[in-house]
């Protein structure tokens, strides 16, 4: 590794195998970042790392597994000198009416969307503090408003927003905390819904109006590239034609 490579910022991205995570990896790599791609689907992040070249490393990790995250953090420290930016992007959106039939979905959303971001940040925090870092938490428009059928998903995003504000106050000015709240984005998330009627409704809604993952990634890159005296704390993004929350 040459001196120029050593000076480039390092961004760790969870959920990097697709959607906003993969798009953000491409955007930050284009801006000169060395990216560490974390996800469960190792084949996808390996292919993405190959696409991006030697600026990227692929690390198999599940954000619900603290031991896996500790191993990932150790590898980032050893191979890249530590993280400067953490993008907490891993998430699931398992919408549906509230019932005991959905109880596993509820647990999964809480473990991934909320506890996953908290644990990943806890594990990487010392690295981020060492040189002036950024934490970017990918929330949702559902973190501002709830609607029928998205109650637990919204709860995880409201929780993420509340924790992010507390974290921002604790870590300033050395580590900036940014919350990104996308509306409808063309990603895999709606396809993972297990409640069939809700899945069909979401597919129809998403077929009418979305933005791309690249649109969101561009905003993330803008936020982390601001001068250190400026912090962008919260960004709400919707397709221009999205009327519903």
Task: Identify the residue ranges that each predicted region occupies.
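Conserved glycine-rich cofactor-binding loop
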Residues: 17-18
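Conserved glycine-rich Rossmann-like NAD(P)H-binding loop of the short-chain dehydrogenase/reductase
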Residues: 31-48
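The beta1-alpha1 cofactor-binding region of Rossmann-like NAD(H)/NADP(H)-dependent oxidoreductases
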Residues: 61-71, 103
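Substrate-binding pocket helix/loop in short-chain dehydrogenase/reductase
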Residues: 97-98, 102-107
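Active-site helix of classical SDR
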Residues: 121, 156
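Residue(s) in the substrate-gating loop at a strand-loop-helix junction
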Residues: 140
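C-terminal helical subdomain
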Residues: 179-180, 199-245
């Amino acid at each position: 590794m040459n001196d120029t490579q050593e000076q480039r910022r390092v961004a760790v991205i969870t959920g990097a195998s697709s959607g906003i995570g993969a798009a953000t990896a491409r955007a930050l790599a284009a801006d000169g970042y060395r990216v560490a791609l974390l996800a469960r689907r190792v084949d996808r992040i390996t292919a993405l790392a190959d696409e991006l070249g030697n600026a990227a490393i692929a690390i198999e990790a599940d954000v619900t597994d603290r031991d896996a995250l500790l191993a990932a953090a150790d590898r980032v420290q050893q191979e890249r000198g530590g993280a400067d930016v953490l993008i907490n992007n891993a998430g699931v959106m398992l919408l549906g009416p509230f019932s005991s039939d959905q109880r596993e979905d509820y647990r999964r959303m809480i473990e991934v969307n909320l506890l996953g971001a908290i644990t990943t940040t806890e594990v990487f925090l010392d690295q981020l503090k060492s040189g002036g870092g950024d934490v970017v938490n990918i929330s949702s428009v559902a973190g501002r408003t709830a609607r029928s059928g998205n109650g637990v998903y919204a709860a995880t995003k409201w929780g993420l927003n509340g924790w992010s504000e507390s974290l921002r106050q604790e870590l300033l000015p050395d580590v900036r905390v940014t919350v990104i709240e996308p509306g409808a984005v063309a990603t895999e998330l709606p396809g993972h819904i297990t409640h069939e009627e809700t899945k069909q409704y979401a597919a129809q809604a998403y077929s009418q109006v979305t933005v791309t993952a690249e649109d969101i990634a561009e905003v993330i890159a803008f936020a982390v590239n601001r001068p250190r005296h400026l912090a962008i704390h919260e960004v709400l993004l919707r397709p221009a034609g999205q009327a519903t929350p």
